[in-house]
Amino acid sequence: MSKIEKALKRAGDERGNLQLVPAAAAVERTAPWTALLGQQIELPETISRMGGNEGTLLSADELWERGIIHPQHTEEPAVQVFRELRTKIIQQSQGQNAVILVAPVSKGNGGSFIARNLGAAFAFDSAKTALLVDCNFKNPSVHRLLPDASLPGLADYFENPEIDISKIIHPVGIARFRAISAGELREIPAEYFVSMKMRRLIDSLRERYHERFIVLDGPPMSDIADARILSELSDYVLVVARHGRATNAQIEGGLSAISNKKLLGIVFNDEPRIPWRR
């Protein structure tokens, strides 16, 4: 059993209930989370149109090399954990699309690992699409998922008033999954996230596909100003802490920047790679 799964399982084994945070600083959750199984959902036209521009899809082994789960590995604990995270968010949002900020407590806590796999889990569902946005300008990673790491991204969108949003959204080799990299960073202006252009971007990304779930790969919560701004732009926040490394003071300090109404919970992560058996 992976450390991620253990952390989630410790919070409660009651059938249909998933608690992410076994910590005193977390907000208690009482809403029942019921798995969405066996539903017959008509494929939206927007998803059908997306299917024509997927690029070359990656195999399960190729995704493994990139640290991404694959739905074929149905018996692997990590796959089930991310499915449960996805189900919790879908239940919380009452089936509507949502913007989820994934924020590590500090650098090296595995936030990008959680963010990309949460996005992949949404894309597992044939009635959903996912978009991963790299908002961690000091330590970007999403460009590694793209067919060409030099493709334009978020910084290019802010710097170039002529660039269209569609030019920064790229396939990553997974059906129904797209990504926006950090882009070419000449500097890291503090005003990027507070600009109206950022808010308009998030609104546009949300409205473009009503079945799209947007995952923001956020900066560490030690960058409290950016974390607070991005949390205000998001519907929900998922905090990531590396088990045995993040201190209670760090976790509580990070949580102070987040509204209790938006906090989904904390994932305790201690696996740099997906721990399935070979």
Predicted regions and their residues:
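P-loop NTP-binding module
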Residues: 1-278
